[in-house]
Amino acid sequence: MRVLTIFLLFMTSIFAVQIKDVANTVGVRDNQLIGYGLVVGLNGSGDGTSSKFTLQSISNLLQGMNIKVDPNDIKSKNTAAVMVTAKLPAFAKSGDKLDITVSSMGDAKSLQGGTLLLTALRGIDGEIYAIAQGSISTGGLTPRPGGAGSHSTAATVMGGANVEREIPQNFSQNNDLTLSLKVADFKTANDIERVLNTVFGEEVAKAIDSRTVKLKKPEDLSNVDFMARVLEQDIAYKPQSKVIIDERTGTVIAGVDVEVEPVLITHKDITIKIDPNNNAVANQNEIDMKDGGFVDSSSNTLRINNAKSTVANIARMLNKLGATPNDIIAIMENLKRAGAINADLEII
């Protein structure tokens, strides 16, 4: 069973990045939206009669069209109740398009090929900020045993919603400008302060703590002009190593140099051994998988040469062995829990 695995290779050495890549402007942020809707047109893969809220929703929808139907008389399996979520970006204007995520609430088997009906998306204040509607595509992958493939009960619809209401902003009149680092780090905060004060020739930045840098706009610049110049300045930066696994697609994203320390773990019927002796020769009963990996079919053990033990190599070898996304996630979590992965592990 093959798993789609993608490796984005990057080095963790120090290099120059723009301030906008490592810090956010406080107050300039996305806002979460949520709504409840119905997906219709499913080929028998929708909610069953046990999902009472779906039947009631269908009845309510038809009643709004002057068609009265008792929820108990509805037997359609071509409809699914869903939650729809979206992010409303800062400064979004009426008519802008938003990407939406549609997720099944009931016992639907798949949303593939369905159509999301008109759904109001509300903010935390209960107001409607966007309207969603459109065709659903789950990526064309069918669900497989063990979690391989995409989740056909959830989908992202690009441009599936229109912004109807704008969030009031007073950025141009705001005199309290602050940067918030995406990853707290005293050195980065100090570097931002030093670079900005040097560029502007006056004290325009003050590092308050490991995450916060207060800004003071020069009188001859507008807020927009000032922040544009601030955010484009380069600083020296060393990114924190990270491994990201997309549970839905099985995609693994890792740096080429994210190493795994010597360890021995067992997951289900697979044993993984990172060989501290750097033995690059196949032992008896072992098959050379290349890239420093050897499989002992008699004990179902994957032995990896320590010099080649990176997250990328381990994921690639597990993929060759037919491991499912769920297996890879569990193995990576166990490696992290054992202290063998020197990077942050994020499951999305």
Swiss-Prot record:
Main location: periplasm
UniProt keyword Signal present: yes
Compartments, record wording: Periplasm; Bacterial flagellum basal body
Pfam families, sorted: FlgI
InterPro entries, A to Z: Flag_FlgI
GO biological process per UniProt: bacterial-type flagellum-dependent cell motility
GO cellular component, one term: bacterial-type flagellum basal body, distal rod, P ring
Keyword Plastid tagged: no
Subunit structure of this chain's protein: The basal body constitutes a major portion of the flagellar organelle and consists of four rings (L,P,S, and M) mounted on a central rod.
Protein task: Assembles around the rod to form the L-ring and probably protects the motor/basal body from shearing forces during rotation.
Protein name: Flagellar P-ring protein
Protein source organism: Campylobacter jejuni subsp. doylei (strain ATCC BAA-1458 / RM4099 / 269.97)
Lineage of the organism: Bacteria, Pseudomonadati, Campylobacterota, Epsilonproteobacteria, Campylobacterales
